[in-house]
């Protein structure tokens, strides 16, 4: 279970042995020689995720190199006015400034764009398929949460933490009703199966 949890956290967006180490795999009791087999097993067990990384990688490169729009499912990739746009199912767009092709440290072709780096300074940032997938997944997750916030606008929502909403209400408000409303599927992403869980507490804490 421990191996599975750290693998999900570290490997979902292209991470490998280095990502496992950064997440504390060695401190959790895993041995160095276990890490690469864990990466290989995770990727073997999740072929659709791995395939999506590289489908997105190709779509981004096509948009930047050929200026041609393309789609993967309900996500669109296009180049316009010196910007790379990734259009999400909600219609919201992620924007990457002045994208161009470059060569990464492994000698492979990669996409770079201008943005704020880790040192909080404007610089050219290198990216690739799995990283763009991370941006897409987190952005869609945000849009789903925002849809839930609007659905529950009749409640007093005084905060949210990642995928959680914190609602202050009287004790006679039904938790089941709130969970049902929060788990409704947005009209712009039909077919996605959502379920919300909740709990009641006198003060905010992790369940």
Residue spans for each PLM region:
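Conserved catalytic core of nucleotide polymerization and phosphodiester-bond processing enzymes
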Residues: 1-207
